[in-house]
Amino acid sequence: MVRTRPVPCVPSPDVNTATRRNPGRPKKQSIGADLSTTISKPGRPKKLSIGADLTTIRKPGRPKKLGADLTTIIRKPGRPTKLSNKQSLTALNEPECRIRKCVVKIRRIKVKNGVVSEISRNDAPDVDASTFEPARNSTMYIPSKVQKSTQPQNIKENVAGPETSPCQQRIRSKSPSGPAAEISPKKPPRFFHRDQPLTRTRSSVTRNVFDFLSQSQIEDDSDREDPAADIIQRLVKDGKACVMVRSRKIGKPRAKRTAKKVRPVGNRRKVSTKDNEPEPVKVVPKSIEPRLQKPSRSLSTIFEPEEDYSNDSEHGYVQPIEVPVQVHVEPSTSKQAHEGAYSNLARSVMLNQTQAQNPLPSTDRRRELINMARQLVSTPLNRRAPPVTDVSATTTALSPIAHQSPNAVRTAGGKSPWRVSDDSPLPNTFMFGFNNSQMPSYSSDHVQRRHVYVPDSPVEHAENIPHEESICPPLHEQNHDSNANDSNEENRPPPTISKSMSINDQESEENAENFVHLPNPRRTLQKRTPFKDINILEVVTLPSWKKNVTATVSKEITPTRVAPRPMATSSPAQRSQTRSNLFGFDDDFACEDIPRKSTTPSKGIAPTSMSLNREVTPALANRNQTEVNTFGCNEILPCENIPKEKETNTEERTSSSQNLFGFDEFITESQDSPANFTGLSQNVNLHDKLHRLAELRPRDGELPQVSYTSIRSDCLGESHSKQTDIRYMLCSTMIAPPRPAKRKPAAPTARESMGLFRVDQDEPEQSFADKQPRRTYVKERPQRKRKKRVQILYIESESEDEDEQDSHDKSLDSPEKKRHHVKRPRRDIEHEAKLEQFVTSFNKQCEEVEKFPVIIE
């Protein structure tokens, strides 16, 4: 605040006895004349002058313009001229002007740190020494935006002074100028720089708002430091970055040319160490010291913030741009700590808040919470293998790589053959599943799962589990099986309940890594692992994708090893599904599947297949006779009476063919299908069963001989090349090469005449094959030939047409000739259309003839 000299020519007692003026617009009085101002009744406040002092006191009421600065008063051009001292005195002493009894004496005093100097305190009571604060509605009031963000609210103390008049009161406010000066100590005080040229704008009033904001948001601060300037300079110096400059000629940015400093080789080392010196001084000693005090512990992949990291979750803490502020360390007074976004005052306030709310033992509390979380969810780096018991160690491991000892340190991906550590003992040979590429499938590349918690004591849990298999798998399997890259997922039947569970099976469930071969193929809870062949539980032959193949045969191929309890394994839904897919062939299955005690095999049946009858799936074996009769097969003999001769075979065939829902006409065509699917199984015993099924069908001599050559090439032959089986889709499944059908080589000599007819039949197809390119989108090559054909239709003169051919390219300019060429081929198109119509009708007739089987008697 500026101390001003009181004007000696004004006697103070005269002012107090001033008369009250009538309400109205008062005359303007000069400020230099007297420091005492009259406050009239409320009216429209005048605009504040530019040099006005903002920290002046006022009495309650709406003031007239109090120009605080005595040196510079800038007036608008329309205002009246300044009154002299005499004029102002006469104006005051005139009897017309009634002055209110409220008199304000303004005295400017420098206040240091909010303490009024001794001189001002000892002054006469009528002289008020408090700082001036304008009212909210006055023109001298600073806008509310600025008031909120920069200055804390002024705390007013109403001190009752000596009552000179009933309305006189002194308002002493605790000035905020002391702490406000501390916010930016570098800059000169903003409000009272009288010696500088007065260019005062609205933005300069609100400028200290930005002390709390980051440096990047200060727009009008020219000398602020770029936080990343040193990094950019170092990058440019190292040659990793280049400064872009806008070129004067073109205006496009170009790289600024920097002169390369050629240093001698000896000095090069010294310069690099100088550049790197300031870095360790900043960061290293502070970060290392708290870590040295802690006991060393095993690392885990859970990220635990150390003490020297800033805790982002703490209340009111925001991480600065450049230097991470260490919350629990006392803030250093050096300049390095304050290079971030916050001013000194803001940083100290926030650090005091966080330290009050988070005392030092909060780190121990955080460590406790982290340990509690680690017990619940853990992702250990070195996953400990559960101890391998002797029983499971003897069983064959599925992976060809030998398991390491449980105490050995294992890498994250040690199980896969493609991620083998150098120390792990490898076998001499790798057994890969034979798919077509002779490479291991994706399921063999077993990636070890992260985020799986292995309990510390798996043996204790295993003792408590009763010897009973639950329907749902254990928790850790249930959660993560869907994520595993495991090809056995689609082959799983519905879960089974079987109480015959060995101790070995339970251990293999408890220990996630001890995978063993299990004798039961229908076991649901086993995991899919590399190099394991898939047990195909059920293969459904899909109906043919061709329209003319009407009869679809669907058979169930069963595994050899049968579950110990047959009824439990096959659910009723499965049985009904396989039952409905069997159309008319279920009687064969019913007769063949029921085990016979004393029957001698017929000629066609192999003796080995008879012994295997007991192993057939219970889904078919448990069918009773009433279930068979639902399909209308009442005439079928009981299954013990299976004939030993061919004649009764034919009788049974005819009786079953009556129940084929009208498909019995095509039974000769679909007879071949079971022989086609025999070669697709992995199991030797299944082959024998299917061969035995084929032998139950009638022989070639018993049926009228049908020529299969033409039909097979068109209708049925493509089913050999097409892979219509779901087993071709599965990975790591061994696919046997398809066997040739039996009936191809045994063709009778009577079919030679058919072959002759077929040669004759192929001729028209070959003769008209030249027309095929016309149907494509390719431009036709023989254009000249078409012109020759046109010449025959339009005979004018041969010489003209020959000239036309030669000059066709030259005469394209004339539009008349163009039109002529376009019109000419129309008759030729009609001719071709008739030809094509004849060809298609002839081909249709040939196809219809082919459909009828030629029976040679």
Curated annotation (Swiss-Prot):
Function statement: Regulator of sister chromatid cohesion in mitosis. Probably involved in development of the central nervous system.
Modified residues (Phosphoserine): S173, S175, S184, S222, S405
Protein name in the entry: Protein dalmatian
Chief location: nucleus
Polar residues: bias regions: 146-156, 165-176
Start-end of Acidic residues biased regions: 797-806
Basic residues bias: start-end ranges: 251-271, 817-826
One record GO biological process: peripheral nervous system development
Pfam (any one): Sororin_middle
